[in-house]
């Protein structure tokens, strides 16, 4: 599950744009949708329908979530979901803690030109954990994997399908399924940090790139106070070690990234390594095709 704590300016602009698009005949989803950066995160507008209620919402793109997620306050107050519509379930937090949540089924979700019916979502107390930084809706893999999606981070557009032109680099990934079924199609990429081999988990809902502290030398580390949290524990400021401008190779793509150092064995990347690129996320082929 993603880590969420950032400034809310991007979501505000997304909602303004979405409201205008629907006022002009609901054509926001005909070909593509705008993307709005917010720190390391990317948001895009969606439309949710539950019964006779139709809601506009800015959704966080999160490759680290198998299911879509609805904030519990938003689910009750805006979607008008009540106890009878919610089923108790369990999921895993980023620290592997088992967390009690609820599930619901939304009648309809319009996302990037495609209508999805009967969308199963997790209902999580995001606002209680991440406070003012919590999104109302998270776009998980169930929607992201339905068709190839082209992310134009230069022009801030999200569209369905392939972009013309040969890819400059094709990144191939592997998947892993959890034993409890809460995590189904996770994206794992081979790479290197410095000169050491790693396997990256791609979590676009994570604020920081993270790597095990034993993979990088002690020289050049900084101490920083950063907000951290997940669905098992509320947001709080922690002192962490950070390494900046680290040479990083993701499959055949080389870049430089900042990393938060952790004691976890799993390395994590957000979309920062793809900044200023145009790429296609294709779950069927298990590829990220970075365009020229």
Question: What positions do the PLM features span?
Answer:
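Bacterial N-terminal signal peptides that target proteins for export
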Residues: 2-16
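Prokaryotic Sec-type signal peptides and long signal-anchor helices
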Residues: 6-9, 26, 78
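Bacterial N-terminal signal peptides
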Residues: 14-25
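Pepsin/retropepsin-fold aspartyl endopeptidases
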Residues: 28-292
């Amino acid at each position: 599950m993603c880590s969420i704590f950032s400034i809310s300016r991007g979501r505000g602009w997304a909602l303004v744009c979405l409201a205008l698009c629907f006022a002009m005949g609901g054509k926001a989803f005909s070909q593509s949708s705008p993307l709005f950066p917010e720190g390391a995160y990317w948001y895009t507008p969606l439309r949710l329908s539950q019964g006779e209620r139709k809601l506009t919402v800015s959704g966080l793109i999160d490759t680290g979530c198998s299911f879509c997620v609805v904030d519990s306050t938003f689910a009750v107050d805006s979607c008008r979901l009540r106890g009878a519509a919610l089923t108790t379930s369990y999921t895993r937090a980023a620290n592997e803690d088992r967390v009690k949540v609820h599930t619901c089924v939304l009648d309809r979700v319009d996302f990037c030109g495609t209508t999805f019916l009967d969308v199963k979502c997790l209902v999580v107390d995001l606002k209680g954990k991440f406070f003012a930084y919590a999104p109302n809706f998270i776009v998980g893999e169930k929607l992201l994997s339905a068709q190839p999606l082209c992310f134009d981070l230069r022009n801030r557009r999200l569209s369905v399908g392939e972009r013309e032109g040969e890819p400059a680099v094709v990144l191939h990934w592997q998947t892993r399924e959890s034993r409890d079924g809460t995590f189904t199609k996770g994206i794992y990429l081979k790479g290197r940090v410095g000169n050491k081999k790693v396997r990256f988990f791609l979590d676009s809902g994570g604020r920081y790139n993270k790597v095990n502290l034993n993979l990088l030398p002690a020289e050049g580390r900084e101490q920083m106070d950063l907000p951290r949290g997940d669905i098992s524990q509320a947001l709080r400021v922690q002192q962490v070690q950070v390494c900046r401008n680290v040479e990083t190779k993701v499959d055949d793509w080389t870049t430089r990234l900042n990393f938060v150092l952790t004691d976890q064995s799993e390395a994590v990347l957000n979309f920062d390594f793809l900044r200023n690129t145009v790429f296609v996320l294709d779950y069927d082929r298990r590829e990220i095709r970075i365009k020229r």
